């Protein structure tokens, strides 16, 4: 098919409606282009539970093999399980998933050997160009005289063992945990990873179903964790965990059913990773995580490094600084011991170890890491984003004790509060995050900024 790749190839991945925007013929071209751009002689491929995933990943495999690459198929897996395979086997990888997007969508997340990201500046632009040319009839390079082999391999047990070796769970007290897999890949990975741990596991929506019959598999949207919150309370559970569709993100709910801020989880895991590393090391966090994160990092002997929002920035900084851990307020958690890739499962194991290693409830445990009042991210439709950012800067430039920085959008910081305004890359939106030392101040700053934006 001749496709509009401008709508299909995003900043970090490929994503679109099947078969309207892409199909198996295009997937085969992506496989060939991936091998050509990465110069790979072998690759690994995994896929999620979407109805179209097996056929699309199979077509990608054929395209790669035709270019002479040996293909290892690991079948059904979470995205972080694919990253594990890419790291452990030292092979470029492709994961077929559209995370929490509706059933008619599918996509490809690609990485180089060692789970190094493939984004626009690291190969995706070249892959897109080749696929565009070939889909429009340009001749492809001749097929390899010796096509690659296609073999299957199960990596789930090895993936689980790798994660469990990174967190000491031997001495934890028994815990009751409700896990909402959202009919996504958490239903595939959680039983194997949690097997043998002193956990009373209450599974919620573990049946793999790419039509998402119960709720969207996006735990950052409050309406999607309502069932989990209710079940935690009904079961008297110690905590709840919610995974997104491809199970690379994990959201935590405490024993009262209250969502735990991903910034608090970032701070908690950072403290534990620093302790594992002898009380030293660099931790990367994006600029909309809480003030709590750099504070906790410094208190535990580490060096915080602040970066832009977006996983490619975190992974780049992780590599540059040799960081031990990185966290985003979107519930992505990155680990040096996991090839700088993100794994919500490893973050979940850290939470279980921290909670099970003491007697108090999770709400008390995370209170030490959740020190400020946050607004969450608030979107406003704005036609001229640049003009709006300039107006906001002008409005605050005459005030005392104000600093500005432009690392990502505009961050305005005062003694007792800060806010960040970022323009969306894809929509006419400004995204606002506010944090303050107390709820009253946060609300006042939030309302003032929103009034200026929406005037």
Where are these regions (language model features)?
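Short glycine-rich phosphate-binding loop at a beta-alpha junction
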Residues: 41-48, 72, 176-178, 281-287, ...
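Short glycine-centered, acidic/aromatic-flanked micro-motifs in structured strand/loop junctions
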Residues: 46-47, 179-181, 214, 254, ...
